[in-house]
Structure formats: C-alpha cells, structure tokens
Design a protein with these regions (language model features):
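N-terminal pre-triad scaffold of radical SAM enzymes
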Residues: 2-38
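Conserved Radical SAM active-site core
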Residues: 4-8, 23-24, 38-114
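Short beta-strand segments
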Residues: 28, 76, 120
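Non-cysteine beta-strand/loop elements that form the S-adenosyl-L-methionine
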Residues: 115-123
C-alpha cells in the first residue's frame, strides 16, 4: 500500500506567490533532497519526522478542512516532488486546483504528477 510521510495538513491563507491571500489546504510532506541553511521548515527535512499516511487518509483529512472559499490544495514540504505518485493519487479525489511548492531540482518527478495547475519553486 502506498504511503508517504506527512508532517501536517491544515487550512490557511497563502502567504506568497500568485495566490497570496487565497484560502488553501496545505499538505506538508517530510523529507527533502537538499539541506539548505536558509530552510524555514527544518522539521520537515527528514522523512522520519513525518507520519506515514495513505492517499485515502490524506484525502479524508483534506475533506474535513474544506470550506466553500477553498479552491486549491498546496503540496509543500520538505520536498513534495519526492512523492509524485502519491500526489497524483490524492489529487484525483478533488476538483480543486493543485499547487506544488517545490525546490525545482527534480523536474522528472514533477512531470510524473498527473494533475498540476500551479508549480511554485524557490530559486
């Protein structure tokens, strides 16, 4: 059964980028392929810091948080592109925009994600 390490799932307003100010559901993965000194989510660098969850468990948590003003699910991390099949599996359960907040270093993995509307990366 497919599982991925998840730090947290929460609803909040996007604080940066094109969708600033919009309510989103955030799925924060654990694990990153880099070790940036300026990282603002140090607790998510190691995959061991997350709770292993199935796509259905994540989808259930997202459903609990959905409100009428929420139109986007943002997958963040750590590095969410480490889990392309998992993101594809969760995304197919929702008719919402799918955003990936990524370091951009795994373009082949990003291409594997079936339904992506927005890719936001840090240079």
């Amino acid at each position: 059964m497919m599982k991925a390490p998840v730090i947290e799932i929460f609803s909040s307003f996007q604080g940066e980028g094109l969708l600033i100010g919009e309510r989103q559901i955030f799925v924060r993965f654990a694990g990153c392929n880099l070790n940036c000194t300026y990282c603002d989510t140090n607790d998510s660098k190691s995959a061991e810091s997350g709770k292993l969850m199935t796509p259905q468990q994540v989808s259930d948590e997202i459903n609990k948080l959905l409100t009428p003003d929420c139109r986007t699910i943002s997958f963040t991390g750590g590095e969410p592109s480490l889990y392309p099949d998992f993101i594809s599996e969760v995304s197919k359960n929702f008719d919402l925009k799918i955003m990936l907040e990524t370091n951009g270093t795994l373009p082949d993995n990003i291409d594997l994600i079936d339904k992506l509307d927005i890719v936001s990366h840090k240079d």
